[in-house]
């Protein structure tokens, strides 16, 4: 299960998610916002952009082999996540954690021994995911989900935290060499977010524009010991100690 703020936040883990799905795991992606603000194209409304972002994410996940019904969008406004009712958002996430009961949670890294810097929605998503993971294990937190909805408390045993600014706390590097093509093809579906679509959205970019996007996606994949990798801060244990 991955929890992110926006429809492309999972891109930092696309190779790993594709590998997990290919090996028989059931991967779910939970996006907190609709992505309905992040454009410089004056022709797009919030409603239009939200639908574009949804379709782009579904297309990207399809490239990774992840079914469309495994994509869950919680519908919050882009850019304002930290101003939402925090308790309500955590309760919403707890519900999905208790429903899906994931073996591993992928999320923005909230930080180790300090609060890691992320831009606003990413910062909020990091801590909302961590707080929801902790709350989900306690039966008397959001107990209506248990007494009225038939869910059960659940503790996520393992965590894979990602970060896009620096990698100093990484301790696990996943070899995605066999899934590079899937990651590149998936990333190329984010037309409204990368390349010329950022300022002038065109749902049918030229072959040259697609090539530029794919080249950029390939260049963004890191190399370690001659292998294409994605890096994470791996943690196993009680949610209380996620940041230690």
What are these regions (language model features)?
Residues 1-100, 241:
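Active-site rim/loop-helix segments in enzyme catalytic domains that contact anionic ligands
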Residues 1, 23, 87-244:
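Metal-dependent de-N-acetylase/amidase catalytic core
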